[in-house]
């Protein structure tokens, strides 16, 4: 009899616990849904504002680029153009952040490879000449 009582009480406790866990999960999922909806709204508003800002900046950058492209450029003008080009790339990277990071990585890698070639080219030439001289002396 005691065993039946213990089993019944254990079953009641387990079912009550399962119901409380299920209720907790439901309330958490409802909160998550509400938070996700509010985040979507915020992102939508932010996206609209960002698009408007990007369009204005792109227009300004194009006007400035046309102004500097038509006349003779000084070194200072050249720097301004470089900055404008960087701003345009940054604005484009806001649309496609993964592609922008890949382009930056690719550009960085190409710069590093060019530096290595500039350094290693003459060094390999000297090593090749030295080895050629050694082979001639040995042979």
UniProtKB/Swiss-Prot annotation:
Signal peptide region: 1-18
The keyword Secreted appears for this protein: yes
Pfam families (alphabetical): Bombinin
Cleaved propeptide residues: 19-43, 74-118
GO cellular component, one term: extracellular region
One of the GO biological process terms: killing of cells of another organism
Modification type Isoleucine amide: residues: 138
Presence of keyword Secreted: yes
Residue list for modification Asparagine amide: 70
Keyword annotations of the record: Amidation, Amphibian defense peptide, Antibiotic, Antimicrobial, Cleavage on pair of basic residues, Cytolysis, Fungicide, Hemolysis, Secreted, Signal
Tissue: Expressed by the skin glands.
Domain of life where this protein originates: Eukaryota
Compartments in which it is found: Secreted
Family: Belongs to the bombinin family.
Functional description taken from the UniProt entry: Maximin-4 shows antibacterial activity against both Gram-positive and Gram-negative bacteria. It also shows antimicrobial activity against the fungus C.albicans, but not against A.flavus nor P.uticale. It has little hemolytic activity. It does not possess a significant cytotoxicity against tumor cell lines. It does not possess a significant anti-HIV activity.
Entry protein name: Maximins 4/H3 type 6
Species, as recorded: Bombina maxima (Giant fire-bellied toad)
């Amino acid at each position: 009899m005691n065993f039946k009582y213990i089993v019944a009480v254990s079953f009641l406790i387990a079912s009550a616990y399962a119901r409380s866990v299920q209720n907790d999960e439901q309330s958490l999922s409802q909160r998550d849904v509400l938070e996700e909806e509010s985040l979507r709204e915020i992102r939508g508003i932010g996206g609209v504002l960002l698009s408007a800002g990007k369009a204005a900046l792109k227009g300004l950058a194009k006007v400035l680029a046309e102004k500097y492209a038509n006349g003779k450029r000084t070194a200072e003008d050249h720097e301004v153009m470089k900055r404008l080009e960087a701003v345009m790339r940054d604005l484009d990277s806001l649309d496609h952040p993964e592609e922008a990071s890949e382009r930056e990585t690719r550009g960085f890698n190409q710069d590093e490879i060019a530096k290595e070639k500039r350094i290693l080219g003459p060094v390999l030439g000297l090593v090749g000449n030295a080895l050629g001289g050694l082979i001639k002396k040995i042979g």
